[in-house]
Amino acid sequence: MRRHTALSALLIFTALSAPATRAAAAPDAPPDDLDALSLADKAPTEPAAVARPWRLFVEGSLRRTSIDDPDSRYESNRASIDGRIDATLTPGLRAVFSDRLDLRHSNRPGVEGDVNTVREAYLSWAPTDHQIIDLGRVNVRHGSAYGYNPTDWFKEGAVRSIVSLDPAVLRENRQGTVVLQGQQLWSVGSLTAAYSPALADKPNTGTFSLNVGATNPRNRWLLVGSTKFSDKLNAEVLLYGGEGIREQLGLNLSGLVGDATVVFGEFSAGKGPSLITQALGTNADKRFQTRAAVGLTYTTAFNLSLTAEAEYNEAGPTRRQWRALPGISPFGQLGLLNTSQTLQDLPARSAGFLYALWKDALVRRLDLSAFVRRENETRSRVQWLEARYHWDQVDLVAQWQQFSGSRQSIFGSVPQSRTIELALRFYL
């Protein structure tokens, strides 16, 4: 039990002992973890750094979580190693491997466990400059919105270890889907076809399991066409289906308004089960449902980006349906919350989402980011805040998150009401 605590402490000591005072830029953020951001540009006279095909960091964290009220708490610690390699084997052929190992321990039995996440492991072949074929585990992501992505269908069952509630980190730090995917490119758009075969019918929570039962539980397919109407307007049309899945139609739009504002809209429609039906395991008829997220992002001249988003999920419960759940099943509300987390779906019928990212906030090398989501059915909220300070090879991170609302509300029913975490990351 003590080995994880000792390993976390060792990682923190190693990070603190690393040279962190050189006036150079922080290492580039790995593409599979957007919460690590470079802040300083190299001087024009400095030679360009040679790009490496791999990225690797270790991280240690200490966390305190409150359950329902501040008088009931537990502590946990985590030691992680995270790496990615993107190597060219021959001209036109790449091999990509991305993995994260989280060693976790808590003084509350049954809360935490070690988990390894194979995010990506695939070969990518480009027979021509306009064609790409991928085979293996690929993190297939779609969606123009930020907080909620109705067209990101392969997110279901993909998150094994939640290290941050930041939507960007959740999208990156997840298992990919085993697919055969082909893409045809042209100057103003692309056409993509993906096939994901059934490989297992049940998830496997073993530490080093590939967990294909979560990512590939049935045969599925996806067709995507994208086009660029102008320098300021992009569109993407998607069609998704598979074994036991009614076809789903999706649309993504994004456009530039002025020099500092991006507007976006994401929509999906098709027949499917409600969250309540899935949480209770009943066989109710599938109904036509729509999902949507629309909003805008405004970026100021001083590196502050603000995003406002309206979210809608017709599969989510209304206030009356939510309050009726305990009468149907004693654990119906917790079951719905667990189902929405597994599916990465919005647990309410509608919500508002605000996100802010401030790079070089107040002082150079300090990033501040935060979001609040308020669902409109029971008027509860989830809030998250992160402060991240960068040295050359070390990040110091503080995170806080809280679920607020009455105990009968959607987010107020989450048992882990408040969490604070301190972490150190060391780039190798």
Regions from the language model: what does each represent?
Residues A20-Y74, R84:
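N-terminal periplasmic/intermembrane-space "pro-region" immediately following the signal or transit peptide
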Residues E59-D68, R94-H105, R119, I133-L135, ...:
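Transmembrane beta-strand segments that form the barrel wall of outer-membrane beta-barrel proteins
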Residues R73-I81, D114-R119, R174-V178, L185, ...:
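Residues that define the transmembrane beta-barrel architecture of outer-membrane proteins
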